[in-house]
């Protein structure tokens, strides 16, 4: 029986030819330490410190991702929505938390579509899957289909968080990484890694190059929410926290170079 064609999503960019070389179809280069990764991007960085999108930042991130995909690494992405909305902050201003969280989820979809556009400008075939059905712009979240896309050398971007209020996109990244069989969560930040204290308030704070999930939780180090770290700890999923603003750091992280902070069980 011939394989059925995947439906074209209305409103998305015209499909581009699939990569023809072996590396781009999912066979990692010898320089890559990891073959399948989940990249977590903070929404605030997409705004360049402002509300909305900074196209220059999104383009730079897309170029970094394209570099590792061309090397054969399978890349899935979860993006926050903090450049548009933060549910917890809106709640503090009097908005009902559930509704404000859903607004935040819509912000992550806007970021996902923007990244998809810039990745496809780089020639990288990309799919967006959302936890809330949005058939005009994205596929529904289906882990088996996501894995199939990755095996074909496509980037998969997961939007709308978990589709549930009270869950952060950090927790979404941990859950999606486990479900698609990623080897590591690459947590991209605007700082060099995990520090002994907030380096913006304490210039003498020291970078921690290696630490356990348990110690991060026990010391209350504010890198990601405790639920995400607990989920990774319980399932042996390593997290690499690194600075996205240093050009080429995604490739360095995938290649196993000693950058940032490696969090292991």
Curated annotation (Swiss-Prot):
Q: What is its main location?
A: cytoplasm
Question: Which Gene Ontology cellular component annotation is one that this UniProt entry carries?
Answer: cytoplasm
Q: Where is this region: Disordered?
A: 1-29
Q: Where do the annotations place UMP binding?
A: 81, 101, 162-169
Reaction equations catalysed: UMP + ATP = UDP + ADP
The record ties this protein, via SUPFAM superfamilies, to: Carbamate kinase-like (SSF53633)
- Regulation of this protein's activity per its record: Inhibited by UTP.
A GO biological process held by the record: UDP biosynthetic process
Q: Is Transmembrane helix given among the entry's keywords? A: no
What HAMAP family does the record point to? PyrH_B
What protein name is recorded for this chain?
A: Uridylate kinase
Q: Which organism is it from?
A: Mycolicibacterium paratuberculosis (strain ATCC BAA-968 / K-10) (Mycobacterium paratuberculosis)
């Amino acid at each position: 029986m011939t394989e059925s064609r995947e439906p074209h999503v209305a409103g998305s960019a015209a499909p581009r030819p699939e990569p023809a070389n072996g590396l781009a179809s999912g066979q990692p280069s010898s320089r890559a330490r990891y073959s399948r990764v989940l990249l977590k991007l903070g929404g605030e960085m997409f705004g360049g410190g402002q509300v909305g999108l900074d196209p220059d930042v999104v383009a730079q991130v897309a170029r970094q991702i394209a570099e590792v995909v061309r090397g054969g690494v399978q890349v899935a992405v979860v993006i926050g929505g903090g450049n548009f909305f933060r549910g917890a902050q809106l709640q503090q201003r009097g908005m009902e938390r559930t509704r404000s969280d859903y607004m935040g989820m819509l912000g992550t979809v806007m970021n996902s579509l923007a990244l998809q556009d810039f990745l496809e400008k780089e020639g990288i075939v990309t799919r967006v899957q959302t936890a809330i059905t949005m058939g005009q712009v994205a596929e529904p979240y289906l882990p088996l289909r996501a894995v199939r896309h990755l095996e074909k050398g496509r980037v998969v971007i997961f939007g709308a968080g978990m589709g549930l209020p009270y869950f952060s996109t950090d927790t979404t990244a941990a859950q999606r990484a486990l479900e698609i069989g990623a080897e590591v969560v690459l947590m991209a930040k605007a700082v060099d890694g995990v520090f002994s204290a907030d380096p913006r308030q304490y210039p003498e704070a020291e970078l921690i190059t290696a630490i356990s999930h348990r110690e991060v939780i026990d010391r209350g180090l504010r890198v990601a929410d405790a639920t995400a770290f607990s989920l990774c700890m319980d399932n042996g999923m390593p997290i690499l926290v690194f600075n996205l603003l240093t050009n080429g750091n995604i490739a360095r992280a995938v290649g196993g170079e000693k950058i940032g902070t490696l969090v292991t069980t």
